[in-house]
């Protein structure tokens, strides 16, 4: 089982993030990930990229479920007004 901070660190180490928030209960996590790496990618491609970063933790069973919102920096700025 992973802790929220561990999930955040793994994502941050594997993906350049302008903004990253992770919340969870040890089994299910939610993440808001803002990365310039998402520019030009579909929602599915973005999620696949995050899943790639976390693959070994999913495969080992340490991480069970992650729901995510993925945004480019421009999308994030626009959403915040």
Language-model features: locations:
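C-terminal structural segments of small proteins and small subunits
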Residues: 51-81
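Charged, amphipathic alpha-helical segments and their flanking helix caps
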Residues: 43-53
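Solvent-exposed beta-strand sheet faces enriched in polar/charged residues
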Residues: 23, 32-34, 69
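A short interface-forming secondary-structure element
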Residues: 32-45
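N-proximal, solvent-exposed amphipathic alpha-helical segments enriched in charged/polar residues
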Residues: 1-18
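Short edge beta-strands and adjacent turn/loop segments
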Residues: 14-30
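Histidine-centered active-site/metal-ligand motif
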Residues: 28, 47, 64
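Short, internal active-site loops enriched in acidic
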Residues: 27-28, 37, 72-76
């Amino acid at each position: 089982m992973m802790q929220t901070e561990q999930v955040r660190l793994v994502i941050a180490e594997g993906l350049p993030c302008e903004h990253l928030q992770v919340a969870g209960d040890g089994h299910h996590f939610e993440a808001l990930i803002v990365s310039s790496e998402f520019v030009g990618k579909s929602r599915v491609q973005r999620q696949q990229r995050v899943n790639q970063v976390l693959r070994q933790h999913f495969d080992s069973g340490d991480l069970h479920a992650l729901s995510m919102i993925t945004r480019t920096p421009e999308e994030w700025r626009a959403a915040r007004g």
